[in-house]
């Protein structure tokens, strides 16, 4: 296949008159449906992974299970640059997505196998019985000797499945977003903006279906059934994307932007050192702006080996990276939604819900995440159809960087609200505890309804509408055409760093020297820990970063305004 294959491109003007998606609805619909199913599978894994590993027969501690989930989510983002490179240099975006969905499906098979007793015994061996000590409950003499952290059962098989799924998710994540935008990019920035809105809407619809149905089945029916359903979702997503090949706009791989980027950076650094050694000879090369001369020396017109376009693309990337760096604390807080927020949920009073059987069912702790997703489903159409058009007509539509800053403010408020709630929960635990069984595990909860967590989830949902959507839009629109997959991969790469930072901080505060989360109690109880300190620490880090981000964003907007006249035609 040579060049770009674009079905139904005959009459662009007529299509534009009929609507920005005219002639592209089948392609966009296939992308959105595949993403919806993929997200349903992803949240089917992550929503109750802490509960799955925290319960019998695995009996991982709450902090251990939370760290595993944070590491998994970090991998799904850190692997994105590799997925972008694979698409750009070897396979093309469409084939890379198909391959990653196949790998995704292979990894998903591990979870129903771990949930089934016979296959679990084959993979992990027979369990060794251990005495569980309830160290968090009061003793008559006020003393209790807690055991050290127990070995994590089935850890190799669990992490193998998580790694395979993580690599599949990473490659899909890096490519499906720009691939979907490719279907409408010739229709202008308005089509791209609207696609990203509906793309994010599909992500959250998949999340709601997964959290509302799959999480309920996992907690109250069976983890085996609850993990078979997301496995089937990945299989259907693979078939949908395979069948959509006839209507997709596809492009062959045209070289890796990452390869060019590293070659240019290496050459520029070497030439800078050589130029500094010759600086006393009166050449005056580095008497100009060092930032420009550093990369301009790579151009053929300046005696370098690289074309003008490639050097300019790398210069554009270097200007974008500080924004991605500033988003790391945002993602660190964001990923608490499915880890420490869930751990907090399990230690609040969770109501029972009616069922058609005589078995008592409890409200899935993961359902709180739906407040975030439902809010996004409701507000994105409102934003797309009403708010944005009104702001645009009056010239008040904020830039993507300004929207990211607003999102940072709301996520800071979310972490702060979680810390306040945890402080109150610990006060109530000292007075009275409630024993509640969730997923086969007994938790000693505070007599405080789980609904008090709604504000922190709502605040994260509002932050997503501003920061996450604007971040995707910024990564795609600020990227040169030759580096769109690469920059999208870097966007997710720095998101993954945020998840790893959260895992690292959680491990750090679990050290006995700090003692915030160092209590090894009945596989997950946090009543003798100080989780609120962790939440307040996250809020403080994000608040300080917000101030720095405002400086970075203002500087970037000014630089963009200076160069926009010459490069706007290559950006969306």
Swiss-Prot record:
It is found in: Lysosome membrane; Endosome membrane; Early endosome membrane. GO terms for cellular component: early endosome membrane; endolysosome membrane; endosome membrane; lysosomal membrane; membrane. InterPro entries: MFS_trans_sf, POT_fam, PTR2_symporter_CS. CDD domains: MFS_SLC15A3_4. GO terms for molecular function: dipeptide transmembrane transporter activity; L-histidine transmembrane transporter activity; peptide:proton symporter activity; peptidoglycan transmembrane transporter activity. The gene is Slc15a4. The modification Phosphoserine is found at residues 279, 297. Its main location: membrane. This is Solute carrier family 15 member 4. It is a multi-pass membrane protein.
